[in-house]
């Protein structure tokens, strides 16, 4: 959660950092899709997926290693029985699942709309992808934990909507900057 407050609202109850970083992944995917097509965009997603899951799993294993040093549990036992290590593992699986499903859906929606007005494909695909990402991630990571995951999901999605709007102009600039020699047809 984001620690702090804005206009008297406690942001920790409604917002996570992923709301700000995740839309940048859509910017990269949509720009790659526009310039090079669906195949290269899918490859970018797979690399991002592997990198993100690996980093989170390393963090989970790091927590488990600290717990297992006490001698009471093995590394694998600590990973599944220590609440902090298991939460990180659950977050890794939720994040990876949500990222992969949402980004691949984003690529397909973008491709269907690629011949429309320049902003429709990135706006619609990011909107649909962000919704799916938010739904999958927060449900898998936090459902049944007693944490305020529904309010985090709502705040996260609203922040993603703002970020989608803010990133449309950089999308247009990147596409114009790199367009002619690299661009795939339409």
Give residue ranges: language-model regions.
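Membrane-embedded alpha-helical bundles of multi-pass transporters/translocases
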Residues: 82-100, 109-112, 116, 144-152, ...
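Transmembrane helix-bundle signature of multi-pass membrane transporters/permeases
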Residues: 49, 96, 123-131, 153-160
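Transmembrane alpha-helical segments of multi-pass membrane transport proteins and ion-pumping complexes
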Residues: 26, 30, 52, 56, ...
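Internal alpha-helical transmembrane segments of multi-pass membrane proteins
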Residues: 114-131, 182
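A structural feature that tracks compact, well-ordered secondary-structure segments
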Residues: 112, 125-126, 137-143
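Hydrophobic transmembrane alpha-helices
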Residues: 1-46, 53
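Alpha-helical transmembrane segments and their helix-entry boundary regions
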Residues: 40-45, 118, 122, 149-153
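Membrane-interface interhelical connector segments
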Residues: 61-88
């Amino acid at each position: 959660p984001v620690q702090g407050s804005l206009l008297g609202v406690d942001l920790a109850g409604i917002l996570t950092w992923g709301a700000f970083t995740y839309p940048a992944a859509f910017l990269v995917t949509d720009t790659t899709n526009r310039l090079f097509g669906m195949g290269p965009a899918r490859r970018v997603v797979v690399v991002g997926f592997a990198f993100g899951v690996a980093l989170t799993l390393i963090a989970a294993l790091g927590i488990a290693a600290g717990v297992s040093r006490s001698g009471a549990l093995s590394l694998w036992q600590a990973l599944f029985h220590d609440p902090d290590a298991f939460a990180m593992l659950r977050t890794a699986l939720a994040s990876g699942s949500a990222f992969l499903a949402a980004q691949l859906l984003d690529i397909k929606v973008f491709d269907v709309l690629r011949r429309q007005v320049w902003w429709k494909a990135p706006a619609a695909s990011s909107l649909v992808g962000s919704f799916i990402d938010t739904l999958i991630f927060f449900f898998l990571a936090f459902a049944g934990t007693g944490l305020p995951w529904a309010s985090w999901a709502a705040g996260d999605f609203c922040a993603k909507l703002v970020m989608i709007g803010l990133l449309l102009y950089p999308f247009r600039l990147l596409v114009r900057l790199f367009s002619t020699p690299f661009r795939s047809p339409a």
